[in-house]
From Swiss-Prot:
First and last residue of the signal peptide: none
Function of the molecule: This protein is one of the nuclear-coded polypeptide chains of cytochrome c oxidase, the terminal oxidase in mitochondrial electron transport.
Protein name as it appears in the record: Cytochrome c oxidase subunit 4, mitochondrial
Gene: cxdA
Lineage: Eukaryota, Amoebozoa, Evosea, Eumycetozoa, Dictyostelia
Organism whose genome encodes this protein: Dictyostelium discoideum (Social amoeba)
Residue stretch of the organelle transit peptide: 1-24
Localization terms from the record: Mitochondrion inner membrane
EC number: 7.1.1.9
Catalytic activity: 4 Fe(II)-[cytochrome c] + O2 + 8 H(+)(in) = 4 Fe(III)-[cytochrome c] + 2 H2O + 4 H(+)(out)
Keyword Mitochondrion: yes
Top-level enzyme category: translocase
UniProt KW keywords: Membrane, Mitochondrion, Mitochondrion inner membrane, Transit peptide, Translocase
Single Gene Ontology MF annotation: cytochrome-c oxidase activity
Length: 148
């Protein structure tokens, strides 16, 4: 009798989990329970609409957006605050291109429109070993001409 009850309860449990998963219960619960932040909602909106960094839609999205409190305090745009990788790339770009070559805004615009410039990342050997070898230097920026 006990074995029969345990089999019934086990089959009942399996039946309910299949019904619950069919309704998407777990996906809905995870999205609603975690209380996403404004930043997460913006990132999700961009991902859902296939809006990539550097596209006109990306720029328009952040231009139309009211600046967040953190953006006002830090002086950085919400686009840079939302995507740390973009922030790092902009910093490296400014360090490696604008400051190093002392470009005017017109020259910088010309370079951005006509060339693809790498950020000049540090080498893996420079990042990993402790202490850092003295002979390791940053990679030079790689400039490729875009064929228009």
């Amino acid at each position: 009798m006990f074995a029969l009850r345990s089999i019934r309860s086990a089959t009942k449990a399996f039946q309910t989990t299949s019904i619950v998963s069919q309704r998407g219960f777990l996906q809905t619960t995870l999205k609603n329970v975690l209380f996403p932040t404004e930043r997460q909602l913006r990132r999700q909106y961009l991902a859902d609409n296939h809006i990539k960094v550097g596209s006109p839609e990306f720029d328009k999205f952040y231009e139309d957006l009211q600046p967040s409190e953190l953006s006002k305090q830090s002086g950085l745009s919400d686009a840079l605050l939302d995507d740390p990788i973009l922030h790092i790339c902009v910093i490296k770009y400014n360090k490696n291109i604008v400051q190093r070559y002392n470009l005017t805004p017109e020259q910088e615009k010309d370079i951005m429109e006509n060339y693809n410039v790498s950020a000049g990342d540090p080498s893996l050997e420079q990042i990993l070993p402790i202490p850092v070898p003295a002979h390791i230097f940053e990679e030079l920026p790689i400039v490729k001409v875009l064929n228009n």
